[in-house]
Amino acid sequence: MRVVILGSGVVGVASAYYLARAGHEVTVIDREAGPALETSFANAGQISPGYAAPWAAPGVPLKAVKWMFEKHAPLAIRLDGTRFQLQWMVQMLRNCTAERYAVNKGRMVRLAEYSRDCLQALRADTGIQYEGRTGGTLQLFRTQQQLDGAAKDIAVLQEANVPFELLSPAELKQAEPALAAVSHKLTGGLRLPGDETGDCQLFTTRLAALAESLGVKFRYNTPIDALAIAGGKIAGVQCGNETVRADAYVVALGSYSTNFISNLMKIPVYPLKGYSITAPIVDAAAAPVSTVLDETYKIAITRFDQRIRVGGMAEIVGFDKTLRAARRETLEMCVNDLFPGGGDTSKATFWTGLRPMTPDGTPIVGRTPVSNLFLNTGHGTLGWTMSCGSGQLLADLISGKKPAIQADDLSVHRYLKDAPGQTRPAYA
């Protein structure tokens, strides 16, 4: 089968690789000059199935109000003047109940755990290298309230049989020796030994090369204007003056997926702006061994070979990609507070990206009401974590195979209601 994939981020490239392995003739189209040059370029570097959790959680609405008055708040909201933003936020608020949180987190952990298994199999099969580490992830708590609040996450981990360790301040330094100097600032930590880290952009670039060796064609610097429709199906992709035709089409355009298919269906994927800095390591002993997540500021600090990546935060501000100095200040403050002297933040590069977020946190992967159109988008902050599993899942669906995990609640159909001649978002 001929398959066209729109988007060459980590999710699009993973989809291409697994589809090619399944024997399909695959073409990837992207407006950028190469793979992983937008959202996948400089993310936090975590592959963390155990920490897969929706931003829509109990208590978040009240926290959001409090964060409005904090200098280093992990969340910021600025109205972008669109009705869609307001609808999306209302839908997110409706997912902030304990019941919805448990359902959504369960879905996310299921896909994320499967994705890590797929990544490990890929690594064993190909030997792909991407500055990866398998030292686990460590969530750091600065208050007793945060430590107590981890109970609901631990319950989900136990239900999903995800290994974890609850660490005291004294035990934190066994996982991350450099934290010994600041253990008095911490009340404890939740360690997930099965999690991993790695450079997402490097991984995507090398996976694209592997996909090319399987026959995948990459068309970069190519405009993606519209989908051509005929007889209720996709007849091609309009790319400038050319129409590219295939048997099946995959939209993996991240935050831009929503507008691109808006004439066909309304999907609630909104850009969640995040930031990162990447600093050279100056003292390896003072740098992290693997990765930590500061629960207070929602910031991840990840060790690559000779660099430290510090990333996180969320801004609901539309497609604004302005680099804000205050956000860099927060990232520098966090890493210098926990790992003083580990990296030279004065020489750090500063980046921002738009994560494609759904109101319930779960991505949209699978079939659509249009028979030959598939979606692989909406992964939020977990595109790197969920990429391989999402790609394999999509390849199975397009190939007519039964997926290895439950997939019906991951598709767009959970958001759509039938209406005469159309589909629309289930906001009501």
Swiss-Prot record:
Catalytic activity of the protein: a D-alpha-amino acid + A + H2O = a 2-oxocarboxylate + AH2 + NH4(+)
Annotated FAD binding sites: 3-17
Essential cofactor(s): FAD
Pfam families (UniProt xref): DAO
Any one GO CC term of the record: cytoplasm
Any single biological process term in GO: D-alanine catabolic process
Alphabetized Gene3D superfamilies for the sequence: D-Amino Acid Oxidase, subunit A, domain 2, FAD/NAD(P)-binding domain
Keyword Ligase: no
EC number(s) on file: 1.4.99.-
Keywords: FAD, Flavoprotein, Oxidoreductase
Pathway where this protein functions: Amino-acid degradation; D-alanine degradation; NH(3) and pyruvate from D-alanine: step 1/1
Class in the EC hierarchy, top level: oxidoreductase
Entry similarity comment: Belongs to the DadA oxidoreductase family.
PANTHER family: D-AMINO ACID DEHYDROGENASE (PTHR13847:SF280), SARCOSINE DEHYDROGENASE-RELATED (PTHR13847)
Identification of the protein by name: D-amino acid dehydrogenase
Organism: Burkholderia orbicola (strain MC0-3)
Gene name tied to this protein: dadA
